[in-house]
């Protein structure tokens, strides 16, 4: 594998998705993957083009060193993300949620964040609304089943020559232990235990 070629070892320890969030007053409830790509490519610029009100779309992105930004780049595939000005790149996940939450001028906003953070750590309530993608809402269940299309594994990656009794190996073993998986679940992540992942395969 590509990882092994560089002398590294990897394994999944949790599963998460990227949730697409809009202002709760936005009438649009679902987007297709193609529509979502066109929005963040700058091809769809008004909500009326996807069944919403006549409101310009304000598409927020994350910083280039953000995990959710890198996931969105992967999701876009050969379709490049449009260049977003600095003011449309909040520096934190909470900052992204804040600009989407109800305030003057936020009705047309759309953005994305790690599901575990947006749903369990930041909270939704009346502040934001998750958009369905291809008819599937982001939940732990749909992320685990793969029904929600913007889901992926989180991997631990370390050098393959790390000592067996070293701190790195011990941490890796803990991440896949009962306590480690419980910690991941409490943080809002779906765990590899949920799908019966076999580390011996």
Please provide the spans of the model-predicted regions.
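Exported/periplasmic ABC-transporter solute-binding proteins
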Residues: 1-201
């Amino acid at each position: 594998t590509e990882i092994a070629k560089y002398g590294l070892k990897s394994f999944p320890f949790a599963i998460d998705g990227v949730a697409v969030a809009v202002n709760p007053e936005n009438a649009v409830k679902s987007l297709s993957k193609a529509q979502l790509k066109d929005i963040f490519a700058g091809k769809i610029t008004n909500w009326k083009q996807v069944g919403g009100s006549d409101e310009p779309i304000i598409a927020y992105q994350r910083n280039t060193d953000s995990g959710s930004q890198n996931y969105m780049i992967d999701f876009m595939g050969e379709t490049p993300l449009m260049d977003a000005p600095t003011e449309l790149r909040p520096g934190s996940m909470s900052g992204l949620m804040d600009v989407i939450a109800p305030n003057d001028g936020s009705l047309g906003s759309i953005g994305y964040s790690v599901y575990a953070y947006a749903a369990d750590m930041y909270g939704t309530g009346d502040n934001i609304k998750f958009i369905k993608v291809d008819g599937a809402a982001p939940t732990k269940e749909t992320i685990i089943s793969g029904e929600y299309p913007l889901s992926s594994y989180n991997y631990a990656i370390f050098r393959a020559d790390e000592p067996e009794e070293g701190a790195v190996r011990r941490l890796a073993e803990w991440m896949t232990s009962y306590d480690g998986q419980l910690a991941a679940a409490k943080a809002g992540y779906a765990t590899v235990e949920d799908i019966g992942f076999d580390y011996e395969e």
